[in-house]
């Protein structure tokens, strides 16, 4: 799916970010990308911060024995932003990691934001450290990074949550939208592929159906 838009696989040693509102298909794209990495003989780390990952959905999209696939998937389900940091640190000890996925990178971060400046400063430092560790471990393992992100309101409509930090360190940024049963991916930022290209697709029970690719 993403290789159609990026004109190649998810780039290694950099962050690819997909952002959009809830229910548009971000997790489905993560699962498809995960299965692609496993097909290439790699293990995948999946950090699920929102409880979105479904074993049944993995089975539907793969059409294979899920028990066998799960041997290649290391799943973490942190319940706090600190636990998310701890999960990232564990990746340094793993072998043959081809892809690191964080589904909902700032979900726990946003839940813990409060009116106390000191606490928010601590959270911001933790987010910066997580990005640093992500990039460090991806370079060590020669792996790709795929993160999903929520949205927030802005003057121009919606924009990714997480501020300038995530925007700066994400070398690929993809927006996902939904209109009835049709989803649209738009490439907003990339070092090599053509920015502005978009891909329309449908989510089916057993996969994703590409409708067309165009430039806007």
Curated annotation (Swiss-Prot):
Keywords: ATP-binding, DNA damage, DNA recombination, DNA-binding, Nucleotide-binding
Binding positions for ATP per the UniProt entry: 20-27
GO BP field: DNA recombination; DNA repair
Single GO molecular function: ATP hydrolysis activity
InterPro entries according to UniProt: AAA+_ATPase, DNA_recomb/repair_Rad51_C, DNA_repair_and_recomb_RadB, P-loop_NTPase, RecA_ATP-bd
Pfam families in UniProt: Rad51
Keyword ATP-binding in record: yes
Domain of life: Archaea
Protein purpose: Involved in DNA repair and in homologous recombination. May regulate the cleavage reactions of the branch-structured DNA. Has a very weak ATPase activity that is not stimulated by DNA. Binds DNA but does not promote DNA strands exchange.
Family from the record: Belongs to the eukaryotic RecA-like protein family. RadB subfamily.
Annotated protein name in UniProt: DNA repair and recombination protein RadB
Organism per entry: Methanococcus maripaludis (strain DSM 14266 / JCM 13030 / NBRC 101832 / S2 / LL)
Gene for this chain: radB
């Amino acid at each position: 799916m993403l290789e159609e838009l990026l004109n190649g696989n998810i780039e290694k040693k950099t962050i690819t970010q997909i952002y959009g509102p809830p229910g548009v298909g971000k997790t489905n794209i993560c699962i498809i990308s995960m299965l692609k990495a496993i097909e290439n003989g790699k293990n995948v780390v999946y950090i699920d911060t929102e409880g979105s990952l479904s074993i049944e959905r993995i089975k539907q999209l793969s059409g294979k024995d899920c028990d066998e696939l799960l041997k290649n998937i290391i799943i973490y389900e942190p319940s706090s932003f600190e636990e998310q940091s701890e999960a990232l640190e564990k990746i340094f000890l793993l072998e043959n990691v081809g892809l690191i996925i964080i589904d909902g990178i700032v979900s726990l971060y946003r839940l813990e934001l409060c009116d106390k400046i000191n606490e928010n400063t601590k959270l911001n430092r933790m987010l910066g450290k997580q990005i640093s560790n992500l990039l460090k471990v991806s370079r060590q393992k020669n792996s790709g990074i795929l993160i999903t992100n929520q949205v927030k309101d802005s003057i121009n409509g919606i924009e990714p949550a997480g501020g300038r930090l995530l925007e700066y360190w994400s070398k690929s940024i993809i927006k996902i939208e939904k209109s009835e049963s049709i989803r649209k991916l738009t490439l907003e930022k990339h070092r090599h592929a053509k920015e502005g290209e978009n891909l329309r697709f449908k989510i089916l029970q057993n996969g994703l159906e590409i409708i067309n690719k165009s430039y806007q």
